[in-house]
Amino acid sequence: MGTRYFLALFLILLVLGFKVQGVAMAQEDEADSPGLLTRMQESLFSYWDTAKAAAQDLYQKTYLPTMDEKIRDIYNKSTAAVTTYAGIFTDQLLSLLKGDQ
């Protein structure tokens, strides 16, 4: 079952790679236009800035000090738990890969 996902992912990446190569070859003639990566980066940055501004606006509209304390406390507890479990997972993965020596 895992190999199906890897095969599907490989095929998707292969198709995207050929698509990007085709776009890159077509854009070689247009030297003064920005590259695909630059356009994608600018687009992602604009989406990120828009989302960040909307989140800040929503936060400022609904700011409650007691709720803010609760959210900070939940965040601290959850990051501590994730750090602990990530360490356990890393140890298990390393022992699995390293094996008995």
UniProtKB/Swiss-Prot annotation:
Kindly list the biological process annotations in GO that this record carries: lipid catabolic process; lipid transport; positive regulation of phospholipid catabolic process
UniProt keyword annotation of Ribonucleoprotein present: no
Location in the cell reads: Secreted
Explain the post-translational modification.
Answer: Proapolipoprotein C-II is synthesized as a sialic acid containing glycoprotein which is subsequently desialylated prior to its proteolytic processing. Proapolipoprotein C-II undergoes proteolytic cleavage of its N-terminal hexapeptide to generate apolipoprotein C-II. In bovine, proapolipoprotein C-II was found to be the minor form whereas apolipoprotein C-II was found to be the major form in plasma.
Region ranges (Lipid binding):
66-74
| Source superkingdom | Eukaryota
List the Pfam families.
Apo-CII (PF05355)
Q: What is its main location?
A: secreted
Do you know which Gene3D superfamilies this protein is assigned to? Apolipoprotein C-II
Record-level GO cellular component terms: chylomicron; high-density lipoprotein particle; low-density lipoprotein particle; very-low-density lipoprotein particle
GO MF entries: phospholipase activator activity; phospholipase binding
Disulfide bridge positions per record: none
Q: Which family does it belong to?
A: Belongs to the apolipoprotein C2 family.
Q: What does this protein do?
A: Component of chylomicrons, very low-density lipoproteins (VLDL), low-density lipoproteins (LDL), and high-density lipoproteins (HDL) in plasma. Plays an important role in lipoprotein metabolism as an activator of lipoprotein lipase. Both proapolipoprotein C-II and apolipoprotein C-II can activate lipoprotein lipase.
Report what the protein is called.
Apolipoprotein C-II
